[in-house]
Amino acid sequence: MMKIITFKIPEETLLLLDAYAIKHNMNRSEVIRLAIEKLVVDEMKNEPVPRARVEKIKF
């Protein structure tokens, strides 16, 4: 299930986003999801997942 988010973006960036969307026959949401995936998901694939250190509780 996808969540709806709202954010502000500079008008110049929005114009570039729209131009990219038109060129690639995509809508704004598709372009934004692709950009986030490229930036965040691809980068995180190369980093280890942080894990919390948990110690046993002694009774």
Curated annotation (Swiss-Prot):
GO terms for biological process: regulation of DNA-templated transcription. InterPro entries: Arc_rbn_hlx_hlx (IPR013321), CopG (IPR002145), Ribbon_hlx_hlx (IPR010985). Disulfide bonds: none annotated. SUPFAM superfamilies: Ribbon-helix-helix. Pfam families: RHH_1. This is Uncharacterized protein 59. It comes from Sulfolobus islandicus rod-shaped virus 1.
